[in-house]
Amino acid sequence: MSKEHTTEHLRAELKSLSDTLEEVLSSSGEKSKEELSKIRSKAEQALKQSRYRLGETGDAIAKQTRVAAARADEYVRENPWTGVGIGAAIGVVLGVLLSRR
């Protein structure tokens, strides 16, 4: 799952949920109890679906993070001096940036 796909998926889920909740709020004053219960059950169902899908997306992101960490670990184990050099370079850059403040 690519980063762009994940971001778009999250946006679509949140928009769907907010649209459903907006419908509930905007129509609550003019509907009967039966209609309100239908709208409420629709909102609850949308919330459950969004939680499930967002949970799946979170799991996919966690898996991608584990894979990236494993690749970085493997690279550093195969090229330890390169890893030390990268760490030192990052330290120098951060030191310079922090010393300017």
UniProtKB/Swiss-Prot annotation:
The keyword Protease does not apply. Induction: Maximally expressed after 2 days growth, i.e. during stationary phase (at protein level). Expression is regulated by RpoS. The chain crosses the membrane at residues 81-98. The keyword Isomerase does not apply. It comes from the Bacteria. Disruption phenotype: Not essential (in strain K12 / BW25113). GO terms for molecular function: ribosomal small subunit binding. GO terms for cellular component: cell pole; plasma membrane. Residues 1-12 are annotated as: Required for binding to 30S subunits in vitro. It is found in: Cell inner membrane. It is a single-pass membrane protein. Keywords: Cell inner membrane, Cell membrane, Membrane, Transmembrane, Transmembrane helix. Its main location: membrane. Binds to 70S and 100S ribosomes, probably via the 30S subunit. Belongs to the ElaB/YgaM/YqjD family. PANTHER family: INNER MEMBRANE PROTEIN, INNER MEMBRANE PROTEIN-RELATED. Upon overexpression inhibits growth. This is Uncharacterized protein YqjD. It comes from Escherichia coli (strain K12). The lineage of its organism: Bacteria, Pseudomonadati, Pseudomonadota, Gammaproteobacteria, Enterobacterales. The gene is yqjD.
